[in-house]
């Protein structure tokens, strides 16, 4: 499992579960549109949950956009 942040330009940043969402958001200096957790098992993947440190959750289209960016 990884954590992720989506910024206002719909760019995704995946990072270790050991790092807090708020720390990554502060280092990016970007407006956070969504944040949550990413899990992949073969072809199946899921973006879900909510960042407690940002009080921002996943959006329904996050997984679609993450898959598109990873395929590019």
What residue ranges belong to the model's regions?
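Intrinsic low-complexity, intrinsically disordered or marginally ordered coil/linker segments
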Residues: 1-72
